[in-house]
Amino acid sequence: MGQFTVVSLGLLAVFLSLSGAKGDNCPANWISRNGVCNKLFPDRKTWLEAEMYCRALKPGCHLASLHRDSDSTVLAWYISDHFKGAGHVWIGLRDTNRKRTWKWSDRTSTNYFSWNQGEPNNVQDNENCVHLWAPSGYLKWNDEPCASLHPSICQYKL
């Protein structure tokens, strides 16, 4: 009877880990990083359209926010490896008041920046949204007019 109990508990542990009971699994086609799930959507949208699209996916979903170099590296690898030629990709950072005060759409703290050299430059006083800059391998950011059309990357917390 003792071996049966041990085997049963072992099978239960395997089943729970495969079923996602640990709470760290993202849906198919989403990637997991630092407690969040991300997915790139290749359809080109304005920044606001992209943010609204993310919000419609599920409660708490927004354009991606990045808070450390490792976040940038994981997303850069994901985009470069799976979406060749995606072009620039919207993230959730923007200057809503046009005062060069950058805020994430998910309202997390703005404690990390990865601007490309010379950015943000606010060309023609019209660049208030931020994308991952394709020529940098998606590691650096550029400010851009919010009406520009780009793919986007959505994110939600696990």
Curated annotation (Swiss-Prot):
Binding site for Ca(2+): E127, N142, D143
First and last residue of the signal peptide: 1-23
Keywords per UniProt: Calcium, Disulfide bond, Hemagglutinin, Lectin, Metal-binding, Secreted, Signal, Toxin
SUPFAM superfamilies tied to this protein: C-type lectin-like (SSF56436)
Pfam families: Lectin_C
GO cellular component, one term: extracellular region
Calcium keyword on record: yes
Tissue-level expression: Expressed by the venom gland.
Physiological role: Mannose-binding lectin which recognizes specific carbohydrate structures and agglutinates a variety of animal cells by binding to cell-surface glycoproteins and glycolipids. May be a calcium-dependent lectin.
Family to which the UniProt record says this protein belongs: Belongs to the true venom lectin family.
Originating species: Pseudoferania polylepis
Location (main, coarse): secreted
Cellular location(s): Secreted
Disulfide bridge positions per record: C26-C37, C54-C154, C129-C146
Motif (Mannose-binding): 119-121
All residue ranges annotated as the C-type lectin domain in the record: 33-155
Protein name: C-type lectin lectoxin-Enh6
Single GO term (MF): metal ion binding
